[in-house]
């Protein structure tokens, strides 16, 4: 059992993306559902569904444009041993706005851009480009 569930989710997506798989299954949690929702809103994945009653899993449908991957890279920023926090005006941009940062704020999990607009800082979870 892994202790960093977000890193596990990102690693599963990265591995499936490298193999050009259509779907990837991830054990479900509220945080993972919010990250999947953000990935769908930003156009990085096609869709996601939740299956199962007792042991729920999130099935994420990855997106490709021909043989080109839509998700070029994923990076976990805040780790269990080293948490990374940023104020609203210090939230980093990813590749000058080509990617997104995912931030856990007091108002919920959101992209770095939405967190800046809401003037909410928090823990920087991941970069996706």
Swiss-Prot record:
Q: Which controlled-vocabulary keywords does the entry list?
A: Ribonucleoprotein, Ribosomal protein, RNA-binding, rRNA-binding
* One BP annotation, GO: translation
According to its record, what are the GO cellular component terms? ribonucleoprotein complex; ribosome
Entry-linked InterPro entries: Ribosomal_uS8, Ribosomal_uS8_CS, Ribosomal_uS8_sf
Highest taxon of source: Bacteria
Xref: Gene3D superfamilies:
3.30.1370.30, 3.30.1490.10
- What single Pfam family name could you report for this chain, choosing any that match? Ribosomal_S8
GO molecular function (one): structural constituent of ribosome
The keyword Isomerase appears for this protein: no
The record's PROSITE patterns line, in alphabetical order, gives: RIBOSOMAL_S8 (PS00053)
Membership in a protein family: Belongs to the universal ribosomal protein uS8 family.
- What quaternary structure, including any partners, is listed in this protein's UniProt entry? Part of the 30S ribosomal subunit. Contacts proteins S5 and S12.
Its biological purpose is as follows: One of the primary rRNA binding proteins, it binds directly to 16S rRNA central domain where it helps coordinate assembly of the platform of the 30S subunit.
Q: Provide the protein name.
A: Small ribosomal subunit protein uS8
Question: What gene is this protein translated from?
Answer: rpsH
């Amino acid at each position: 059992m892994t202790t960093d569930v977000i890193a596990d989710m990102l690693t599963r997506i990265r591995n499936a993306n490298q193999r050009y798989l259509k779907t990837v299954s991830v054990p479900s949690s509220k945080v993972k559902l919010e990250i999947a929702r953000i990935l769908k809103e930003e156009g990085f994945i096609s869709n996601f569904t939740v299956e199962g009653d007792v042991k729920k899993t999130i099935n994420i449908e990855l997106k490709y444009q021909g043989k080109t991957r839509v998700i070029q890279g994923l990076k976990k920023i805040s780790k269990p041993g080293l948490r990374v926090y940023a104020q609203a005006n210090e939230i980093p941009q990813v590749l000058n706005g080509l990617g997104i940062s995912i931030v856990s704020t007091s108002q919920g999990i959101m992209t770095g851009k939405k967190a800046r607009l809401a003037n909410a800082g928090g823990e920087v979870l991941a970069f996706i480009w």
